[in-house]
């Protein structure tokens, strides 16, 4: 028997060495991915105990045969006493395979008690059974006891929940049920004592919770979610959805103007007892609000600020219809405005010099030039700060017969004709033509004052040819000359 054990151990060593050499040879020929797989297989083999491999090689028998069972028991019973009283060769085998010797010495099998050999055989690996974790009845009972809420705590939670619902719904109605000073923050003593409708709701809540017994943990979370929503004074319909806080918080952070809110747009956010007609009425009332969908005051202030920063022409185009000029355009120099006023009122003055002004101030006279027939000229030697020279333009005057039907317009065609007549007329030819074209009712015109005449007929002297300016004026001051 000693020789048999020695031969068996040597054969096992040879087979293990051959298998290792074969695996090394295969790994040399395999790809890196397959080598990783082989390493994983090796790690799995190392986790198993060595005696399983030895027992697999030693006990090569069919599981269903009774003869193999008898042979296995005989071999194990014969090997066990021999290992205790063996020579030095057996000690060498025990040193080489300590797991095998230990399992053979200490393992005591209950062969006659088992129905099948496969359940109690030491050769079977037990790694697959580790994956299956069966819960015993005691563990299940303890878990149920932990999950199950006691009657007192359950009634208390349901009572709190119904009380909060009551307070929130009645706060929505603005009824004097809740005290104005405390609001929603009441003491715990007042929560326990409920009125008759509160008790009815508690009974209904208990009946619903008995139907849905699996949602007991969710009900506790619902009370906390209602508490968090009641802090802001709002009741959101997010029961059973703990992750909806991010979606429901931003609706009531702030409004631009009092208009439509989600509470009125979405019927789910309204109280449960409100009818559809009331919801429709509230929505129509909000639609009739004049401030519906209007920008907020900060937005309006920002718009006006951007409008004021625009240049004059663009701002005027945007303000079309309001006729409101910005303050910057009215900042024309007072001396320039006085000179323009004197030039317009004085019929003898045709050109004048403005004080030194920059380009921005000279550009402010450009809109006035078509209105008063002015040419704004600047000295080219000093472009940055040069005096502006305003001269009156020559315009052709065509005297038409005045309309006898409208007496009020007898003084106005003179000025209008001076701007609209296309044919140029020399002023020397114009002077003798004026007394010849007197209307029949000239007495009315003669009755006017001298100042009125000067203002009524400025184009006759205001628009002069540039050649006449150089030649000078030799006419008497009584005539309409320079």
UniProtKB/Swiss-Prot annotation:
* Keywords carried by this UniProt record: Phosphoprotein
Task: Mark out the compositionally biased spans (Polar residues).
Answer: 468-482
* InterPro entries, per the entry: Splicing_assoc_domain (IPR051189)
Region (Disordered) location:
195-222, 408-482
Residue numbers bearing the Phosphothreonine modification: 91
Locations of Low complexity compositional bias?
414-427
Q: Where is the composition biased (Basic and acidic residues)?
A: 198-215
Q: Which domain of life is it from?
A: Eukaryota
Residue positions, PTM Phosphoserine: 31, 86, 88
Report what the protein is called. Answer: G patch domain-containing protein 2-like
Gene name of this polypeptide = Gpatch2l
